[in-house]
Amino acid sequence: MRHRQIAVRDTTLHVAEIGSGGTPVLLLHGWPEFWATWLPLMNRLHDQFHLIAPDLRGFGDSEKSAVPRSDVGANSHADDMAALLGALGLESVGVVGHDVGAYAAQALARRHPQLVDRLLFFNCPTASVGGAWVHHGHVNEVWYQSFQQLGLAEALVGTSRETCALYFRHFLEHWSHRKDAFEPAFELWIDNFMKPGNLRGGFDWYRSQNALRLAAIDGHPTPSVRIHQPTRVHWGRHDPILKSEWSAFVPEHFDDARISFCESAGHFVHVEAPDEAADVLAEFFGGR
């Protein structure tokens, strides 16, 4: 595993890479995650692909903002990734997105289509979800999206290692169908979020998405260009926060999307069912 700090635009991103041959594949993590969420796949596929796992702006070991920001949404992350690929000398890559990374991957395909050969998603939220965010039975799932925009959220969650662990254990267990999926790496997760600025970096995503999400809930989603690249979606059947039935919205945004489901996983298919996820990735990007 190689680790680098690479200057892009107005920030510096941490990038983990493994594998020197084969198709380059960019792995875009979600929240509450960072580059290491891809380790199960990187360990399985490094002999077939050049795997590139950055920490998104504000996450992991990438540069942090000194103050809360509300301008680091999907387009910002997409432009960061375009600059990163340029710095790495890569003209076109396969892209894997999950959660926040799924939004960023879609924005990358729309804003910089020449850089994206094909797309794989381990859940694929779209603007068409709209009012489903606050439907009966789901509204209680999204409380954290408002809480994390408050100034006190960072102070409360980061009061101590214990409070940080309590907070993130909730999401890693509740969103997983296999409840012990993150247990081997749990302390690494808390190490990550206890680093200065790492709570803020993740919370900034929700500040940045708030206006767009509220508009979509009100029936006014941001118009988007359809994505033409070949696309594969492998959604965890038991995902409680990005529900698998929302896969029905995917064809509204993609011209060439194949959708399947992981019956043994919730939100984190790549961690809960890594063998299956690795097989899907390898088949789609031509590794085996």
Swiss-Prot record:
Matching Pfam families:
Abhydrolase_1
AB hydrolase-1 domain sequence ranges: 24-274
Task: Read off the InterPro entries from this record.
Answer: AB_hydrolase_1, AB_hydrolase_fold, Epox_hydrolase-like
Extract the SUPFAM superfamilies matched here: alpha/beta-Hydrolases (SSF53474)
GO molecular function terms noted in the UniProt entry: hydrolase activity
Assembly notes: Homodimer.
Q: What role does this protein play?
A: Catalyzes the hydrolysis of various epoxides into diols. In vitro, shows the strongest activity toward the linear aliphatic epoxide compounds, since it shows strong activity toward (R)-epichlorohydrin, (S)-epichlorohydrin, and 1,2-epoxy-9-decene, but very weak activity toward (R)-styrene oxide, (S)-styrene oxide, and 3,4-epoxy-1-cyclohexene.
* Assigned protein family: Belongs to the AB hydrolase superfamily. Epoxide hydrolase family.
Q: What is this protein called?
A: Epoxide hydrolase
What's the source species' lineage?
A: Bacteria, Pseudomonadati, Pseudomonadota, Alphaproteobacteria, Hyphomicrobiales
